[in-house]
């Protein structure tokens, strides 16, 4: 079992990256949101989930930049009919908080994703509603990301992963300008990344 991997991103594709760890390239599947903070040459640390694909006799690695996304995948794959690939598709469309809210509010439209039929959506809502409400009430630091603030800070030259790690702590009800102002103060200790 692999708990996490740290390395340099060698290649970025539509649903995965190749992460170079001590000159070994690992194919790691990521959600679209996690892929947004990966670029060639960046150094990252990913939490890892391992999935054995018995039909193809292979093992696939799924990576996460935060524990919330990893926890969501673990919950989703416990639902009968939800594969790792399907769970990653869900996490590519919805943030963990959006997913939790969709389940708690029984929002079938939010969960409408390619490959998810009505029966599977109902099963996800039914099987996870109790578990999600417990997680939500126990996790006070769980906020969605302000994408406008992320984009603005990256355009100012700050590294994507540092921007993401900084902004994910802020409450969503803050104005974008306030988030940027607060993040700039926190990021001022970091060097500006002059590579585009």
UniProtKB/Swiss-Prot annotation:
BP-aspect Gene Ontology terms: DNA recombination; DNA repair
Q: Does the keyword DNA damage apply?
A: yes
Does this UniProt record's set of keywords contain DNA-binding?
yes
Identify the Pfam families for this entry: HHH_5, RuvA_C, RuvA_N
Q: Where is this region: Domain I?
A: 1-65
Say which family it is in: Belongs to the RuvA family.
Q: Which HAMAP family match?
A: DNA_HJ_migration_RuvA (MF_00031)
Its domain description in UniProt is: Has three domains with a flexible linker between the domains II and III and assumes an 'L' shape. Domain III is highly mobile and contacts RuvB.
Q: What is this protein called?
A: Holliday junction branch migration complex subunit RuvA
| Source species of the chain | Wolbachia sp. subsp. Brugia malayi (strain TRS)
Q: Which gene encodes it?
A: ruvA
């Amino acid at each position: 079992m692999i708990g996490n991997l740290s390395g340099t991103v060698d290649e970025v594709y539509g649903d995965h990256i190749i992460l170079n760890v001590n000159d070994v390239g690992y194919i790691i599947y990521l959600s679209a949101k996690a892929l947004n903070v990966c670029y060639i040459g960046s150094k990252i640390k990913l939490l890892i989930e391992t999935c054995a694909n018995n039909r193809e006799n292979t093992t696939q690695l799924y990576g996460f930049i935060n524990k919330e996304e990893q926890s969501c995948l673990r919950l989703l794959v416990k639902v009968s009919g939800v594969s790792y690939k399907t769970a990653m598709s869900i996490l590519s469309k919805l943030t963990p908080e959006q997913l939790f809210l969709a389940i708690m509010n029984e929002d079938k439209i939010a969960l409408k994703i390619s490959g998810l039929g009505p029966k599977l959506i109902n099963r996800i809502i039914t099987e996870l509603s109790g578990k999600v409400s417990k997680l939500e009430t126990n996790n006070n630091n769980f906020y969605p990301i302000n994408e406008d603030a992320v984009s603005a800070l990256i355009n100012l030259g700050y590294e994507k992963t540092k921007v993401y790690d900084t902004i994910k702590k802020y409450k969503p009800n803050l104005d974008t300008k306030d988030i940027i102002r607060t993040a700039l103060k926190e990021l001022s200790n970091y060097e500006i990344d002059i590579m585009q």
